[in-house]
């Protein structure tokens, strides 16, 4: 069965801020709306009233308010008539939003869909569960919302990093292997930054000054500049004290950010005279034992590649979300991805991992890589807590289209 084509005509993302860092004054909806406005500004042929719906990822929704995707849409200037859906598939939320947007266009229910995701991990609150019924006696415990709803496997009641340690042991990756992967991620990201590779995808954010201080313009991912190779190599393990391999610097960080893409049908592409950046060629999703979520992309990526009518060797570049260095290493080995094709501008270890944003962010960066490094086919995959993963394949089809 031949599916109707779905085109990506614009992308944009915020810089990625560190935890309690440069973007911490911005909410989920601020970050998402900034990315959406920037993406739509690149395609002036599309007016706000032309957009049929928005599908947007977000994981840590406590204290964000009702209907987060709807907030993003209205804050971005989209009309009251906009259909809005918020997606929570943990770290794959942003990618799942893209897949759903594409499916809705294929089904004929929408012609123009804004998709993506955001997260403000800095603004995620602590919870006080006992306050609802009244703490009658003794201490009242606060629960960390970031950890509870973002980083804890509910079945094993263990942190994601413990699963990363299991993955490293199961697949034979040492501390040195993971440190070297992380160092390469930082170096690739630093090189891409210095060469201006991210300029086309990042929409700078202006933070208003207060008490007479000037505004601050944030243009780059905050984590990249924090790289210290000696400190990375000497860092203590976090999740397993004895013979552990996973450290804070060889894993992704807690971050803030947003990313957005504009998808259109072929009919709208022609009607509005839009130049396609890429075509969505296929997607795939998979799941396995919850605590082995780390290697779920090894199932999802081949499914996406097959859905696109390709084989892995025909894909020019890959993006795998680096939740941990071992995630990149293990899935590359299992899928047989040459490391020179993987995350060529660095990954989440160096750039950061705002949970609901990352699945969309890696598609945005993959498109940058295809455009600037001369690739045709690209595949992106992201694991998610609970044992799942999502993957997508895109094809660069118009060399004249500007990011």
UniProtKB/Swiss-Prot annotation:
Highest taxon listed in the record's lineage: Eukaryota
Localization per Swiss-Prot or TrEMBL: Peroxisome
InterPro entries: Thiolase (IPR002155), Thiolase-like (IPR016039), Thiolase_acyl_enz_int_AS (IPR020615), Thiolase_AS (IPR020610), Thiolase_C (IPR020617), Thiolase_CS (IPR020613), Thiolase_N (IPR020616)
UniProt GO cellular component terms: mitochondrion; peroxisome
Gene3D superfamilies: 3.40.47.10
Tagged with keyword Repressor: no
PROSITE patterns in the cross-refs: THIOLASE_1 (PS00098), THIOLASE_2 (PS00737), THIOLASE_3 (PS00099)
E.C. code: 2.3.1.9
Enzyme class: transferase
Record GO terms (molecular function): acetyl-CoA C-acetyltransferase activity
Motif interval(s): Microbody targeting signal: 401-403
Record-level GO BP terms: ergosterol biosynthetic process; fatty acid beta-oxidation
Record's keyword terms, sorted: Acyltransferase, Peroxisome, Transferase
Chief place where the protein resides: other
Pathway stated in the Swiss-Prot or TrEMBL entry: Metabolic intermediate biosynthesis; (R)-mevalonate biosynthesis; (R)-mevalonate from acetyl-CoA: step 1/3
CDD domains: thiolase
Family: Belongs to the thiolase-like superfamily. Thiolase family.
Assembly behavior: Multimeric.
Protein name: Acetyl-CoA acetyltransferase IB
Upper taxonomic lineage: Eukaryota, Fungi, Dikarya, Ascomycota, Saccharomycotina
Gene behind this protein: PACTB
């Amino acid at each position: 069965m031949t599916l109707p084509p779905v085109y990506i005509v614009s992308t944009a993302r915020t810089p990625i801020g560190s935890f309690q860092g440069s973007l911490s004054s911005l909410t989920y909806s601020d970050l998402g709306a900034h990315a959406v406005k920037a993406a739509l500004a690149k395609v002036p042929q599309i007016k706000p009233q032309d957009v049929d719906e928005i599908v947007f990822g977000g994981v840590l929704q406590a204290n964000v308010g009702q209907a987060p995707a709807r907030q993003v849409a209205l804050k971005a200037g989209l009309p009251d008539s906009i259909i809005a859906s918020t997606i929570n598939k943990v770290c794959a939320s942003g990618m799942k939003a893209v897949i759903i947007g594409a499916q809705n266009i294929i089904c004929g229910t929408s012609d123009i869909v804004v998709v993506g995701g955001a997260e403000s991990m800095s603004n995620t609150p602590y919870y006080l569960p006992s306050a609802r019924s009244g703490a009658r006696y003794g201490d009242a415990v606060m629960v960390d919302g970031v950890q509870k709803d973002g980083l804890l496997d509910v079945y094993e009641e263990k942190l994601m990093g413990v699963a990363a340690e299991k993955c490293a042991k199961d697949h034979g990756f040492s501390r040195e292997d993971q440190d070297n992967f992380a160092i390469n991620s930082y170096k690739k990201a630093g090189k891409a930054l210095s060469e201006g590779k991210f300029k086309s995808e990042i929409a700078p954010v202006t933070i208003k000054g207060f008490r007479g201080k000037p505004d601050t313009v944030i243009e780059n991912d905050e984590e990249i500049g924090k790289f210290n190779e000696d400190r990375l190599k000497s860092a203590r393990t976090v999740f397993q004290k004895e013979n552990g391999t996973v450290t804070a610097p060889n894993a992704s960080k807690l971050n803030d950010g947003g990313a957005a893409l504009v998808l259109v049908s072929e009919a709208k592409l022609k009607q509005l005279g839009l130049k396609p950046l890429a075509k969505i060629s296929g997607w795939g999703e998979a799941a396995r034992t919850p605590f082995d979520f780390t290697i779920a992309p090894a199932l999802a990526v081949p499914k996406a590649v097959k859905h696109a009518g390709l084989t892995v060797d025909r894909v020019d570049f890959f993006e795998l979300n680096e939740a941990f260095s071992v995630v990149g290493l293990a899935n590359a080995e299992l899928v047989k991805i040459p490391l020179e094709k993987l995350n060529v501008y660095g990954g989440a270890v160096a750039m950061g991992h705002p949970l609901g944003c990352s699945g969309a962010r890696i598609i945005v960066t993959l498109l940058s890589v295809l455009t600037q490094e001369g690739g045709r086919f690209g595949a992106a995959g992201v694991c998610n807590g609970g044992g799942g993963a999502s993957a997508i394949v895109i094809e660069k089809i118009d060399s004249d289209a500007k990011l």
